């Protein structure tokens, strides 16, 4: 499948840690595109943490990302500057239902999700 991908996967592993009834998750990436990739990676691993907690009955702990080649592409600088001027909104509440993590089935509802208009940026490699 790697030969069919536009880019090789940037993230390659994650580990979980349990302490005091909380589940924490840390993931590793060889490369981190700060504008297009990292925000998606944060939300994806955050969702994985919540799904694992829903499955195990543990409470969410800390989410940690470890990045190797961390970069902001030249053709993303204007978009990133625009992002920095945007109003910050409170995080939404994530509601999970029908979670069957072993079969990859679940429903996600974002409650009170507020956002600014999309900012387009080209994919770089």
Q: What is each residue range found by the language model?
A:
Residues 1-125:
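Active-site helix-to-loop segments that bind/position phosphate- or nucleotide-bearing substrates
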């Amino acid at each position: 499948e790697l030969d069919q991908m536009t880019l090789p996967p940037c993230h390659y592993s994650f580990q979980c840690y349990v302490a005091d009834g909380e589940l924490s998750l840390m993931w590793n990436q060889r490369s981190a595109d700060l504008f297009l990739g990292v925000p998606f990676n944060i939300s994806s691993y955050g969702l994985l943490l919540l799904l694992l907690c829903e499955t195990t009955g543990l409470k969410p702990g800390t989410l940690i990302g470890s990045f190797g080649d961390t970069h902001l592409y030249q053709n993303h600088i204007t978009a990133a500057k625009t992002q920095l001027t945007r109003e910050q909104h409170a995080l939404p509440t994530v509601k999970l239902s029908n979670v069957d993590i072993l079969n990859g089935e679940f429903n996600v509802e974002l409650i009170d999700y507020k956002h600014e208009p999309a900012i387009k940026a080209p994919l770089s490699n």
